[in-house]
């Protein structure tokens, strides 16, 4: 069977990573604008002030999307571009930009998918406590209301939060990302709970103010788990490990269940409640009802996974990777199996249609003497991973796949040192070059994965 006729093939980006124009068009500052002003925070002190200059070049970029056959494009709205302080006055210039982008996409028969939050927390909200401030639930709700009012006449697909594991864990536990803090564990659980409530309020606002029926989802991340063999006990071990909370305290955010059980099952996992009881904020029935506001689809960002088997003691154990295990340029393991087992386990537990909202590879791409960008490693990666996804499509309700990323961009703490794109960006000239993988992806889309 493979992928259905309605399967959505797309690519994804986020606002700060590509837009540039950080100080233009009435935009307010967000935490990444401020964070990157401090030397030593990002590789080689890179910033996103210009990035891919997509703010000025979006029409060219949409033409490139069409040239590689994209059916859909997932992008984030910069909260601080449309509401500079995060609350209060609306910036109409920002609204105009996103309206123009949406219209250009639709003119080129590319379906827009909007992510409300991909880490651009308005700095004025951060100064008021950010995710620690319970008011953020209503501020985020008002922002979602604005998005619904201005864009939902044309855009029907939305994801609320992108990778809350990252913006809480990397931003406030390890300090690797903006705002670069290392706060007490207790504070991170409060932030996480507020973020989950903000998600629920956003779902409510999108439903209430949408100008047509909307498809609303959520896009967390996590390393998936896959079994060493297809023996029943290894499969069960991988499933148990995926939904357990095995991480040490400083990495507690890197799990699936804490972030997805409340949204889709209506409660936090019992294991986590017991383990972290002393760190938890007050959690009410009203909170849980809000967090569990019904969504339509489940998005998951998947890049790699851990191989698991059932140990001799009857407990799941991770299988150590062999020396020389294949890795991407950024150092992430290459584990195609995760794109079969991950969606399968998620669908079995949560029962919602699944989108792969991000998946891709960083490679050391260069422009060759012939003026082209030959990236056979990316083509090989995509072929291996999508072959596994095709297996999953035979067994579960799988709706779409968004390759990360449309184009090379500002890769957070790595700056411009990592290239994930199907399209090469020369940051000195802003020239774009479609990589070999972009053409491979186009051909794969045309035959709907029949060649995998």
Model-identified regions with their sequence ranges:
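N-terminal, well-ordered alpha-helical segments
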Residues: 56, 63-66, 96-99, 103
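Active-site region of glycoside hydrolase catalytic domains
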Residues: 1-42, 85-87, 95-452
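A common structural microfeature
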Residues: 6-8, 55, 72
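Aromatic- and Gly/Pro-rich amphipathic surface segment
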Residues: 29-63
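Catalytic domains of carbohydrate-active enzymes, especially glycoside hydrolases
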Residues: 57-78, 293, 297
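Glycine-rich, proline-tolerant flexible connector loops at the mouths of alpha/beta enzymes
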Residues: 77-90
């Amino acid at each position: 069977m493979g992928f259905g006729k309605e399967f959505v093939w797309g690519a994804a980006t986020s606002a700060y990573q590509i837009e540039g124009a950080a100080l233009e068009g009435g935009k307010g500052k967000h935490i990444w604008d401020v964070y990157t002003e401090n030397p030593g925070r990002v590789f080689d002190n890179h910033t996103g002030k210009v990035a891919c200059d997509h703010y000025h070049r979006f029409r060219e970029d949409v033409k490139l999307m069409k040239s590689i056959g994209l059916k859909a494009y997932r992008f984030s709205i910069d909260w601080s571009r449309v509401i500079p302080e995060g609350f209060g006055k609306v910036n109409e210039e920002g609204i105009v930009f996103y309206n123009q982008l949406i219209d250009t996409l639709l003119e080129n028969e590319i379906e827009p998918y909007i992510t409300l939050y991909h880490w651009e927390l308005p700095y004025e909200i951060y100064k008021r406590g950010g995710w620690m401030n319970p008011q953020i639930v209503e501020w985020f709700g008002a922002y979602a209301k604005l998005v619904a009012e201005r864009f939902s006449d044309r855009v029907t697909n939305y994801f609320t939060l992108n990778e809350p594991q990252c913006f809480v864990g990397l931003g406030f536990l390890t300090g690797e990302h903006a705002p670069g803090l290392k706060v007490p564990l207790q504070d991170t659980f409060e932030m996480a709970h507020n973020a989950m409530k903000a998600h629920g309020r956003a779902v409510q606002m999108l439903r209430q103010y949408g100008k047509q029926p909307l498809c609303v989802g959520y896009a967390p991340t996590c390393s998936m788990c896959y079994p060493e063999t297809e023996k029943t006990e290894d499969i069960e071990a991988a499933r148990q490990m995926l939904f357990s909370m095995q991480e040490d305290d400083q990495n507690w955010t890197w799990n699936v269940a804490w972030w997805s059980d409340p949204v889709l099952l209506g409660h936090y996992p019992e294991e986590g409640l017991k383990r972290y009881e002393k760190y938890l904020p007050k959690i009410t029935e009203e909170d849980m009802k809000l967090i569990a506001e019904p969504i339509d689809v489940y998005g998951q960002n998947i890049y790699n996974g851990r191989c698991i088997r059932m140990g001799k003691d009857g407990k799941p154990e991770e299988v150590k990777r062999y020396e020389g295990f294949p890795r991407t340029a950024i150092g992430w393991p290459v584990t195609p199996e995760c794109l079969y087992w991950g969606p399968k386990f998620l669908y079995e537990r949560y029962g919602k249609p699944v989108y792969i909202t991000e998946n891709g590879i960083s490679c050391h791409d260069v422009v060759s003497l012939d003026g082209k960008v030959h990236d056979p490693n990316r083509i090989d990666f995509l072929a291996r991973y999508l072959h596994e996804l095709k297996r999953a499509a035979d067994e579960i309700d799988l709706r779409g796949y968004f390759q990360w990323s449309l184009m090379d961009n500002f890769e957070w703490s790595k700056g411009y040192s990592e290239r994930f794109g199907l399209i090469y960006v020369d940051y000195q000239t802003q020239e774009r070059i479609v990589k070999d993988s972009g053409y491979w992806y186009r051909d794969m889309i045309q035959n709907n994965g029949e060649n995998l």
